[in-house]
Amino acid sequence: MARLRSMVQAGVARVEGFGLAGFSDEELYAIHTSTLEVLEYTGLKIESQEALEIFSEGGARVDFKTKVVKIPQYLVEDAIQSAPSTLVLAGRNPKNDIVLGGKRVGFINFGEGVSIIDPYTKEYRKTTRRDVANITRFCDAMDQMDAVLRPVAPQDIHPSVAVVHNAEVIFNNTSKHVFIGVEGGRNFKKVLKMAAAVAGGEDKLRERPLFSCNICPTSPLQIVNHASEVIIEGARAGIPVNMLSMGMSGATSAITLAGTLVTHNCEVLGAIVLSQLTSKGAPVLYGSSTTIMDMKNMTAPVGSPELGMINAGVAKLAQYYNLPSWVAGGOVDSKIPDAQASHEFTLTGFLTALAGANLIYGAGMLELGITFDYAQMLMDNEMARMIKKAVGGISVTDETLAVDVIKSVGTAGNFISEDHTYAHMRTQSQSKLVDRSMRENWLAAGAKDFTQRAYEEAISILENYTPEPLPEKIAATLRSIVEETEDEYGVARSLI
């Protein structure tokens, strides 16, 4: 008989519990038809000459002078149909494989930060290559992070070779599936070569892609050259590409959230059309980091209720198209791991999980997605566990209704010693960090708050956790690719 399960990893079981409808069928259809109208009559600006030619040969109306591509309805709908509805994102260790699609819910860390709060000194500083390694290793230890996104940008590495340094460090420090920003076709080929070495060859990598790429259309309604290169090369290699639009309502998209979803949808579907025209059936994710423009502070807040609303809406659009989704949720605007940070993570993380988003990214980052903090990462991991538990819902079966047990205990009894209780007690949520004890026990343990406990646990993980290592020969191959790339760009050797 069916039983509740806690700590469900993305892809292990489909989350079918509590949910959020968000839109009526008529409203989803209205967003869809509005999108088709804009794509066909306004179009997208595409910088890449190769992409323009692919669109033209595929049947789109292309103005090579203005670089505007107008995409007819049938091409959009053909692309939606040919893109896979389910993706298996492989980990270096198959136990870490995850499945995206339907309403499976998973979490992943936020990425691309440029600063960090040191867990020992609480110093605020710029990020380094060593930080990329340490945070990746830390995320590998987080049991509720279902994959790993490049967490921060190393400020001590020359920008032209940062991508290969990131890839080397990440492949060495996690056996989960990884998302790596490659920033163009040339770097994509380098990372592909590295991933093939890890996988045991390009054929094996195509069968089990160990990494995915993120590309960001430029709102409103543009796809720049390096993004097109990654879409095209990813499609040819069978590597999943996440079409991650980053519109800002009121600035780079309409002030109304429905209007923002239209431009967002245009950008993502346009990128998917390019992918499918390049290679039919190429793996893609329907992505989003879209939010609002805070008109008072002139910022793009990631902890706003509107971010949760927009990205829950994006999850529903992805389900409407039967495409795997990746959405922003759980990131925070607070500068330190405080009550504001916890409220913001829970608000947007819960909204997007209830909507059935497949991968929700935002964990571990403060300051509008700029600053990584280890305590925040641990606290977010705990909240992700609770959110997964909550959205799993309540199983209603003969076993869980427990009528026979209730009748046996009768009035004024208790259920503590019942076999039924022992059989199901492990389905209750538990947490190492969240305090549920009585005050006297809390005082005896040092009267520490959530953040203090998280920093202590973070330091313990940093000092004691070791990820599954790469074989020495493969690690040496990755190092040689990094050095080869440094030579090609004329960059001096970077210290490891």
Curated annotation (Swiss-Prot):
Superkingdom field: Bacteria
Family of this protein: Belongs to the trimethylamine methyltransferase family.
Record-given protein name: Trimethylamine methyltransferase MttB
EC number: 2.1.1.250
Example GO biological process: methylation
Reactions catalysed: Co(I)-[trimethylamine-specific corrinoid protein] + trimethylamine + H(+) = methyl-Co(III)-[trimethylamine-specific corrinoid protein] + dimethylamine
InterPro entries reported for this sequence: MttB-like_sf, MTTB_MeTrfase
Biological function: Catalyzes the transfer of a methyl group from trimethylamine to the corrinoid cofactor of MttC.
GO molecular function (one): trimethylamine methyltransferase activity
The entry's keywords: Methyltransferase, Pyrrolysine, Transferase
Organism: Desulfitobacterium hafniense (strain Y51)
